[in-house]
Amino acid sequence: MQTVEFPYRSSSHLILLHVVAESGAWEKHGLDVNYDYKIGSEDAQAGINSGELAFCGGNHVSTYGLRARGSKWVYLGQTVNNVYHSLVVRPDSGINSVRDIRGKKLGGVGSHPILNNWLYLKQRGLDQDRGDYELVMQEEYKPGTMDPTEPEKKLPPLWHWVRDGKVDAAFVGMPSSLFAKAAGLKVIDVEPLPMIQFSSISTNLDFVERHPDLVERFMKGLLEGIAFFKTRPDKAIEIIQRRYTKAGQMTREQAALTHRSLDSVLEAKMFPTMKAIANVYQEALRHDPDDAARVNPMELWNVHHLRRLDDQGFIDGLYGNQRAAAHRHDGAVDQLNTE
């Protein structure tokens, strides 16, 4: 069994990764994937560049500037192309839609979700730089990086800040929105944001060229794990309820809703969408305006491994009589991303 490092940038990825691991898909391909630990943005960059890490499940924003500075970071696939979130407010807040955030305090946590909030609201006429609303962050970030200054600091769920009156509103996804609703807060459905987020398959181009067999086995295992998630819902829900407790202990019903929300946006074939890439690139330009502007965002995407597997019929074959495309719908997924 070959050990492979695949740390996450956000614990929300574990909703999927626990299921993939327990499905036995990676083991089937001779891989012992060490996925259940978090890594900072700068540590991920160093590990991928040195080859200490085979893969990383994230770093979505800072990598475009890195590419301009000589990094060989590449993305091999994308599990989710949209942020499906809800707006959580107090029942007496007077907030009934996104436009009502004007003049209010918006809570934020995680360097990438905060950028998502900025872009989402700007696309809807609310500009943070113009002072249309006040962003209140749960943590500070090292200048020029996506990493918090105190990475070990214990933070309360963001919806607690709404409940306790520290902020007027916050964007959250499942299962956080379920816990917020159960606590009596108002949960408002809003439009999704096309975005590269959740588990991206990140690695180094030199690693890919040196280890094509390992890359193929890893990708096959992940694709098979996604198929298990989609076609074995009862088992997947049981794993989610038992294993994913980072945001709180879910009931069976909450685990089922969380599964359904992720299943509905989980990409069976792991191809990125152009809208998602375009939006994350806008965030890269905000984060690193000079260097990111020197890069065509498509330079970082290398999906020929996926394309070959798809052309061979491997992915559709995982779904029997149903094509894999039939397993991509509309829904809601948490945006507990860090980057």
Regions found by a protein language model. Give the residues of each.
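Short secondary-structure transition/capping segments
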Residues: 46-48, 68-70, 87-88, 181-184, ...
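Secondary-structure end/capping motifs
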Residues: 211-293
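Predominant activation on well-ordered alpha-helical scaffold segments within soluble catalytic domains
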Residues: 18, 64, 114, 118, ...
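Conserved C-terminal helix/tail region of periplasmic/extracytoplasmic solute-binding proteins
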Residues: 285-339
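Short amphipathic alpha-helical segments at helix boundaries and their inter-helical linkers
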Residues: 53, 57, 146, 261-275, ...
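Pocket-lining segment of extracytoplasmic ligand-binding domains
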Residues: 145-246
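Short, glycine-/small- and polar/acidic-enriched structural segments
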Residues: 1-154, 158, 164, 168-174, ...
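Short linear loop/turn motifs
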Residues: 34, 42, 133-136, 255-263, ...
